[in-house]
Each structure stands twice: as structure tokens, then as C-alpha cells.
Amino acid sequence: MGRIKDIFMANVIECRGVYKNYMSGKMEVPVLRNVNFLMAEGEYTAIMGPSGSGKSTLMNIIGCLDVPTEGKVLIAGQDIAGLSDNEMSDLRLYKIGFVFQTFQLLSRQSALSNVELPLSYAHVPRKKRREMAMEALKKVGLEDRVNFMPSQLSGGQKQRVAIARAIVNNPKILLADEPTGALDSASGKQVMEIFRQLNREGVSILMITHDREIASHADRIVEIRDGVLREDNGAEKGDGELREKRAADDRDYDEAGGGDAV
């Protein structure tokens, strides 16, 4: 894994003075402006913003798919400045799980094979790979769909396969970009329940959404507009009934001593 280290950190994400500019013809267009953002280990945060607000650009930088024009970014305690392409790939592979709106499943591979993919890149032996993939699918309630092809799965089931793939390598951070955007409300609710369970188990989750109802499932909401972040306490004063139910669920989970994901 080269310089990618597994060290204890208080924050899994640190962005300090981050700017991102793109060229449009001869003009430099600012997309992110002096972004300062910290996310603690074990936190569940939603970043909200309209189209063109810069939220996807920020997600790409945090996910080590892009680099800032200016500023410092640390992911899982690792400063990404100066990392080689291979080291950036290792950081994504071992420390970050990705969930996308469009699932990004391989159409000619089974659910199990799709989930095994990151483990193949990590050179995990075949038998161990299969065991880990089966366990991840069990966590999302799809142990009875392991041999199904994506075309045989509903939208919600496809997203659950994508979540299993994202967590199979036990990443420090789960990044979710509009994870319910292509789902009906029932499937979206199921995905949010899985995220809550994963967070209870210690997974740090950063979710991007334009939907305040979806954002309210997180413990913290940060809004972005015109490339500028501003903290928002909407999650605290938004859907009170939802938050009360979640607190009760968390208490029940603690009293039961934990358990499998939904």
C-alpha cells in the first residue's frame, strides 16, 4: 500500500482553505471557494446544495478523484498532496467506499461478482474474497440474491448491491452521491435504514443530496451554495418525529448489544 497508512485520527476528512477552479475558454471559473470542512470519525453528515453549487466537485476531491487548485485535504489522516496516481488509487481502494445514484454495476456479472470486485483489486484470495462478499450482501439483506444479474434486480436491490460493494473492504469512509436519487420512496427509505445501521457500526458517512428529507437522516447537515460551505442545523430542527424515532432505534440497538444491518 505504499505510503497509505492505517493510523488513528480524530477526523477522517479535513479540507482546509480548499479552492477549485476550472478553465472555460480563457476564463478561470471558481467552483469551490475557501472551503473549510472537518468530519470526525464515526460521523454521519449530509452536504446539501442545488445543481451547480459545487457539491459534486467537493465529493470528487474528498474521494480522491480530483485535486484542489489550492488548499489542503487529508483523507483518513493522509495528506493527498503529492501522492502518486497509484497511491491515490490505494487510498480509494482501502479507505473509501463509493455509492452512486446510477449504481455503476457490471451488467454481465452477478451480484456476488460485483461485490467481489474491490477485493480482486486488493489481491484478496478467492475463497476469502467470496466469504467477505457474502457477508457484505448479508448486511444489506441480499444473501438470497447472490447469483442474480443486475437485470434481474429492482432498483433498490441494485443500490443495495452497490452498498455491499462499497463496504466489502471495510473502508473508513462511505461517500454517497445522491444514493436515493433513482429510487422510489420505499427503496430510498430502506437505503437510509442501511446507512443508519452502518453508521451505528462505526462507518463514517458523507452523503450528497439535494433532498432535505433525505439529508435529515444524517446527524449533521452542511449546505453549499456557489462553492461556499455554510453549517446548517436543519437536521436538528427539521423532522423532529424522524429524529426522535432514530434516537429510540439507537437506544434499542445499544441495549441489544448491536446486530446485523437491515
Language model features with spans:
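Feature targets compositionally biased, intrinsically disordered low-complexity regions
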Residues: 1, 16, 24, 70, ...
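Short, Lys/Arg-enriched N-terminal segments with co-localized hydrophobic residues
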Residues: 1-8
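ABC family nucleotide-binding domain
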Residues: 10-224
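C-terminal end-of-chain micro-motif
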Residues: 45, 259-262
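Conserved beta-strand-loop-alpha-helix hinge in the C-terminal portion
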Residues: 228-255, 260
